């Protein structure tokens, strides 16, 4: 049996860790560094370069060098190299394969298993794609774990305190997450999580690149954005300047021979970027971290003062403006300086690998699903089966029925999001359950089950209880959730909460009215001989009035018609009850009384159920 490792598969850098004697150890790569750039290059001689070697030749091999592929995970993105198309999974797998090789060289043993981390706000498609990348790399993926959760696991197990509330602020190269967790007695439980899958250090780098391009254009009249090689040099310089500005008040960017002018004379770029200017041009990026932070505090139902520790994760948290913002948001609390933001996630992943392999005892990791899951029901309503921030793995079932008589099949449409109307959420997938036995509407019992495994991957099953027929879908298609979609889900859910609630209530009123008219007519057909023609006429007219009201848009008119039908139905029930009581009066009172009561209760219940 081979060894198990923990891998932080990052946007810009990746890290691998292993348990040695029960203690997590970060493994240095073949170049001697504890972090490996998530860069893959295809050299013109056919060699595939990964990590620092790929990054080093990027300027001279721009079109055949791929970086930040994590931002394309879970989409249909591909890149063509030498007439062969590569998916994001294949490119990610190259990085994983290098980490696997370097770990095997360090351990002197085969590495077969891995726990791989993903941003907490990764969608189902993105998690599935990450797992596939691991499989392509020849790894048995034991578990997909959320990055902030892994960080809290690594941080929390070193603490001697019994109960503690930890806030993890994770700003990496391409993604942002914030999670609130409770740790105590070996249990790591996520209370709430939120994030932004399109926000990370790359965006800060790009702002510096844009600033340099504009400065050069103003000074020299040349637009560097049209020169691929120059842009690659600018990206590398921007990253270095950003890192330098974390410890200095200014950074100089000097790039000789960046391009040539119209007369083929070489041009030089030489600019100095101050920390103040850097913070000014990136302020809006920093502001985008506030909404997920506030959302997590709200969802977890805690106050800032209840947070015991703040843990910063991801190299981008080294920027002074970021750590100052976190301090401000948490009421002046100093973030913990005792963890390495680049390595803590991989360390947590190695610990979780140890838990799953039985090497680490008495540790339980309870993660959550970041967005609600449900299906579309009559009227376009989003019926949620699993609410956001539900602990996973989890399984929830609910029984639905048909909307029409003799309906032969049902279409199950699975959505992810927070809006009350299904169409406003993200469609994850759909499937059909056929072979439903002919029956009046409302009779078939269709049980829909949502099952989210510990990796956060969704399985949905629909089963006809009458025939036993079943159909299952594993949600792995679709393009995942873009930043715009996630922003829309959260912001729209807040902005349109009242509108959604009103529409949902209106649809429920319509559904209830339609059902009541149908059930009342059915009851009248079965019991018509027990009531007078006058009562039958009144009930029928009241049911017809409901049908007429349903044709319009006036919800109050529908409610009035339903109240009238309810009144007439009660009169009908009362008449049937009195008739049966009179018929039973000839029997012996002692023997009859209990039976009459039983019969009345059953009949009354049945009657109510049919209204």
UniProtKB/Swiss-Prot annotation:
The modification Phosphothreonine is found at residue 175. This is Chaperone protein DnaK. InterPro entries: ATPase_NBD, Chaperone_DnaK, Heat_shock_70_CS, HSP70_C_sf, HSP70_peptide-bd_sf, Hsp_70_fam. CDD domains: ASKHA_NBD_HSP70_DnaK-like. Residues 492-511 have a biased composition (Basic and acidic residues). Coiled coil: none annotated. Residues 492-515 are annotated as: Disordered. Keywords: ATP-binding, Chaperone, Nucleotide-binding, Phosphoprotein, Stress response. Disulfide bonds: none annotated. Pfam families: HSP70. Acts as a chaperone. Induction: By stress conditions e.g. heat shock. Belongs to the heat shock protein 70 family. PANTHER family: HEAT SHOCK PROTEIN 70KDA (PTHR19375). One of its GO terms (molecular function) is ATP-dependent protein folding chaperone. The lineage of its organism: Bacteria, Bacillati, Actinomycetota, Actinomycetes, Mycobacteriales. It comes from Corynebacterium diphtheriae (strain ATCC 700971 / NCTC 13129 / Biotype gravis).
């Amino acid at each position: 049996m081979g060894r198990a490792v923990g891998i932080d598969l990052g946007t810009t850098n990746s890290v691998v860790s292993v348990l040695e004697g029960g203690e997590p150890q970060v493994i240095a790569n073949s170049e001697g560094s504890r972090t490996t750039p998530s860069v893959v290059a295809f050299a013109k001689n056919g060699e595939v370069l990964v990590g620092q070697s790929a990054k080093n030749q990027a300027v001279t091999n721009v079109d055949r060098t791929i970086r930040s592929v994590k931002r394309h995970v879970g989409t249909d993105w591909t890149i063509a190299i030498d007439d062969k198309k590569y998916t994001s999974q294949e490119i990610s797998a190259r990085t994983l394969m290098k980490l696997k090789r370097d770990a095997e060289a360090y351990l002197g043993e085969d590495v077969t298993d891995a726990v791989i981390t993903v941003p907490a706000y990764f969608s189902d498609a993105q998690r599935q794609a990450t797992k596939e990348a691991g499989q392509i790399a020849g790894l048995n993926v034991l578990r997909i774990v959320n990055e902030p959760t892994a960080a809290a696991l690594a941080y929390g197990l070193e603490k001697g305190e019994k109960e503690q509330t930890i806030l993890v602020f994770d700003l990496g190269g391409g993604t942002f997450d914030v999670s609130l967790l409770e740790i105590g007695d070996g249990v790591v439980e996520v209370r709430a999580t939120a994030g932004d899958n399109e926000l990370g250090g790359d965006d800060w780098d790009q702002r510096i690149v844009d600033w340099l391009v504009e400065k050069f254009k103003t000074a020299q009249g040349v637009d560097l954005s049209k020169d691929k090689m120059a842009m690659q040099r600018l990206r590398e310089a921007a990253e270095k300047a950003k890192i330098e500005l974390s410890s200095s008040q200014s950074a100089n960017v000097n790039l000789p021979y960046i391009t040539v002018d119209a007369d083929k004379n070489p041009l030089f770029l030489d600019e100095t970027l101050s920390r103040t200017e850097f913070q000014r041009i990136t302020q809006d990026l920093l502001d985008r971290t506030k909404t997920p932070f506030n959302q997590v505090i709200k969802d977890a139902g805690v106050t800032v003062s209840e947070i015991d520790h703040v843990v910063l994760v991801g190299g981008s948290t080294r920027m002074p403006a970021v750590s100052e913002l976190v301090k401000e948001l948490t009421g002046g609390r100093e973030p913990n300086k005792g963890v390495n933001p680049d390595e803590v996630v991989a360390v947590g992943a190695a610990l979780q690998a140890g838990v799953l392999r039985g090497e680490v005892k008495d540790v339980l990791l309870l993660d959550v699903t970041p967005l609600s899951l449900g299906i579309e029901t009559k009227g376009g309503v989003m019926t949620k089966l699993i609410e956001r921030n539900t602990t996973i793995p989890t399984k929830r079932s609910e029984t639905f029925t048909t909307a029409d008589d003799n309906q032969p099949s049902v279409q199950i449409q699975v959505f992810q999001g927070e809006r009350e109307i299904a169409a406003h959420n993200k469609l994850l997938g759909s499937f059909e359950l056929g072979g439903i036995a002919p029956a009046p509407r409302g009779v078939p019992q269709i049980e829909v089950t949502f099952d989210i495994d510990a990796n956060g991957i969704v399985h949905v099953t629909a089963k006809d209880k009458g025939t036993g027929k079943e159909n299952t879908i594993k949600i792995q298609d679709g393009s995942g959730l873009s930043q715009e979609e996630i922003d829309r889900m959260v912001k729209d859910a807040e902005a349109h909460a009242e509108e959604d609630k009103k529409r949902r209530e209106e649809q429920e009123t319509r559904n209830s009215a339609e059902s009541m008219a149908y059930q009342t007519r059915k009851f009248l057909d079965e019991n018509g001989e027990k009531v007078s023609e006058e009562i039958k006429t009144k009930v029928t007219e009241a049911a017809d009035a409901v049908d007429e009201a349903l044709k319009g848009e006036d919800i109050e008119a529908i409610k009035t018609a339903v109240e009238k039908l309810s009144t007439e139905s009660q009169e009908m029930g009362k008449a049937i009850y009195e008739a049966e009581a009179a018929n039973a009066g000839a029997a012996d009172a002692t023997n009859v009384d209990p039976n009459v009561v039983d019969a009345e209760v059953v009949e009354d219940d049945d009657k109510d159920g049919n209204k």
